[in-house]
């Protein structure tokens, strides 16, 4: 939603996601942004664009650029209750997995969007709830296969003294 009034310029957009009669066993993430931020051939972060090479991994494609776009992020728990929502920045994340049809996304808290950090318990196995960014992963090189390698390795690393990325399916 946006305010429109004669002789008034509004810098404030408000988004809201509604989910009706959803039957799901995992959390739901909703991302709302102007379509061109993701799908414009000139500036969309999710598409090949006009400069992509014709062969994998499609260097020159828009998704190889370090572009950040504004997005409204909403996170719904398994019981359909809204857990958290905020304005953020979004970038394509990863190495060659960016070339997959489903791409990983980094969601960034930044003061210019309204939050300097994300304060929410996304993960049960960590002792902190404050994050500068979260990653919505496409399972990397396991994409279109088992889609569980990243999660399985994270589980194996939980009791080690090494840093690891936790997950929430």
Placement of each model-derived feature along the sequence:
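Phosphate-handling architecture centered on phosphoinositide signaling
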Residues: 2-169
């Amino acid at each position: 939603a946006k305010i429109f009034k004669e002789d008034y310029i509004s810098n404030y957009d408000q988004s809201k996601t509604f989910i009706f009669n959803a039957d799901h066993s995992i959390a739901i993430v909703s991302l709302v942004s102007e379509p061109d931020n993701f799908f414009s051939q000139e500036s969309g972060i999710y598409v090949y664009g006009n400069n992509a090479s014709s062969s994998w991994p499609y260097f020159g494609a828009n998704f190889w650029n370090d572009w950040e776009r504004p997005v409204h992020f909403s996170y719904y728990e398994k019981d359909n209750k809204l857990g958290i929502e905020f304005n953020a920045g979004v970038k394509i994340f990863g190495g060659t997995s960016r070339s997959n049809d489903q791409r990983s996304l980094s969601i960034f808290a930044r003061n210019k969007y309204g939050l300097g950090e994300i304060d929410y318990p996304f993960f049960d196995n960590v002792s902190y709830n404050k994050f500068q960014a979260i990653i919505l992963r496409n399972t990397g090189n396991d994409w279109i296969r088992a889609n569980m390698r990243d999660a399985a390795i994270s589980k194996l690393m939980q009791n080690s003294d090494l840093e690891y990325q936790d997950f929430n399916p």
